[in-house]
Amino acid sequence: MACFLNIGRDHISPIEHPTFEDYFESKLRIFDQAKTAVVNLGTEEVDRVLEAASTAERLVTVGVEHPEASLWASDVRMVGFSIEFNLHGLCADESEAGEKILLGIAGDFNVENALVAIAAAREIGIGIDAIKVGLSKFRVPGRMEVVESKDGRVVCVVDYAHNQLSFRSLFSSVKRAFPASPVIALFGAAGGKAQERREQLPREAAPYSDLMIFTNEDPAREDPMKVCRELAENVPDDTPNKIILDREAAVHAAFKAAREEYINPDAPTIVLLLAKGDEELMHVGDEFVPIESDLSLAHRLIDVTQFD
């Protein structure tokens, strides 16, 4: 079975793919030996994906608000820090409302992930009741982890988002969930690859951010200050931004700004710690250096109210 969720203009560098076309064609090869293909109709280049998937013996399609799909979701809604939606296509005699699904992870973009997982599970004979239990308890360490301060003034989201597609999904989802909240976004860009991210990421983040903090993120053999300056050079308009190379110090500064500068008395301030998730290693030079994970830093620092 081969599942195709999405395609973005990423992974193009001297050590990855030379062009987007090469990357896309490589990704489409997942269907070459698949008896069953699962395709998200919400992906870019969907016609080419469906053409490649047509070689499979069985094609299952999924999508959000795509009634033409084999399985599709409607009425996506936030329930606290979880997501609920109605699932259609399970059987011919289902109710018009469909099956109610609770997804125990934040981010409405995760509905597409869930639909692909549901389709794959159904294809191998797993029943919907077991699927519903699994999705309701689903958690990936460092993936859309929500940490809320005890006083409710700050909500931190820790996620592995690190490219244009994941940034677009995450930031738009956060804005829909917290439309009145100031947003502080902390991120960097990896060294030695995917040069285009240094232009794309600040441009994706800026429309949603009140402050961007650029910091160290797996620089490898590149100068991390150079990477951060290139990010800063691509900030559109006049979105406030700063560079703090030390990642722990940058996280500390983000929470300080959330407490002292970027405040809405009627809504929590959102702090986004992006790209590193629950990782405890940083790629520096030719080594992987131990660090405290973003998730650990969030839990440790979110309730600090006194700053130097």
What are these model-predicted stretches?
Residues 1-52:
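Flexible active-site lid/hinge loop adjacent to a nucleotide/diphosphate
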Residues 1-14, 48-100, 133, 140-150:
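Extended acidic/charged loop-beta regions that coordinate divalent cations
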Residues 1-9, 99-139:
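A conserved, hydrophobic alpha-helical segment in the catalytic core
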Residues 5, 23, 38, 73, ...:
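Residue-level signal for inorganic ion chemistry
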Residues 18-22, 67, 138-140, 195:
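Short gly/ser/thr-rich secondary-structure transition/capping motifs
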Residues 40, 91-93, 104:
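Transmembrane helix-bundle segments that form internal channels/tunnels in multi-pass membrane proteins
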Residues 41-45, 64-65, 278:
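Short, polar loop motifs at secondary-structure junctions
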Residues 58, 116-142, 146-308:
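ATP-dependent carboxylate-amine ligase
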